[in-house]
Amino acid sequence: MHITQLNRECLLCLFSFLDKDSRRSLSRTCSQLRDVFEDPTLWPLLHFHSLAELKKDNFRLSPALRSLSICWHSSRVQVCSIEDWLKSALQRSICSQHESLVNDFLLQVCNRCPNLTSVTLSGCGHVTDDCLARLLLSCPRLRTLRLENCARVTNRTLAAVAAHGRALQTLHVDFCRNVSAAGLLRLRAACPNLRLSAERSAAMIPDQPPRARVCAASAFSAAPGRQSMPHPTGSY
């Protein structure tokens, strides 16, 4: 029996066992298999392990998408996490090649995938509060949002969760240095039933513009009998 003699249900099952590249390669063999590749029901889950994968044409976005993860574990993540005003020309050049990729991709998700229920972003140092706020508005069924080592995420994302994350049940903002303890406490007060994790976030040093850094250092050195206060960590 030739593969094209299988019915649609069998072909979808067969495709479901293949990775994205293999699905794309098989779809190029004939129009029938290309139609299977284009079937939205084939794409309820999407997992990306590098930002380069976001630019490929080996997947499809549709209202059938339920779970999305973008996990970038690369040495370049450390470069992305450096404060913009501290980056060298070389580091800025490296970031310019990919800094808009995740935000642009998530905007496509907002437009095409309204039924999304779970999003995980790890090592996405350029994803912004505005982009996440739009995601929460565009995907009202979102139940789980996991953010890890996303340097540009701030208390504005927490405020967006409180305002727009009506279906959200679980939020992780782990190792996100610009999320503060005060912001987490406000979110906890606004959403007492939310399962909230902020591993190390409130204990990390947030970004400070050069002038704020100098002023803070001057005030600290001038303060008599200064004492260090412990930062809260873990779940809130």
Curated annotation (Swiss-Prot):
Cellular compartments per GO CC:
cytosol; nucleolus; SCF ubiquitin ligase complex; Z disc
Chief subcellular site?
Answer: cytoplasm
State the CDD domains in the record: F-box_FBXL22
User: Gene3D superfamilies of this UniProt entry?
Assistant: 1.20.1280.50, Ribonuclease Inhibitor (3.80.10.10)
Q: Where are the LRR repeats?
A: 15-40, 43-72, 98-123, 124-149, 150-175, 176-201
Q: Which GO terms describe its biological process?
A: proteasome-mediated ubiquitin-dependent protein catabolic process; protein ubiquitination
Does Repeat show up as a keyword for this record?
yes
List keywords of the entry alphabetically: Cytoplasm, Leucine-rich repeat, Repeat, Ubl conjugation pathway
Stored Pfam families: F-box-like
Q: In which tissues is it expressed?
A: Enriched in cardiac muscle (at protein level).
Pathway in which the depicted protein is active: Protein modification; protein ubiquitination
**Subcellular location as annotated:** Cytoplasm, Myofibril, Sarcomere, Z line
Its assembly, as annotated, is: Directly interacts with SKP1 and CUL1.
Q: What is this protein called?
A: F-box and leucine-rich protein 22
Q: Which organism is it from?
A: Mus musculus
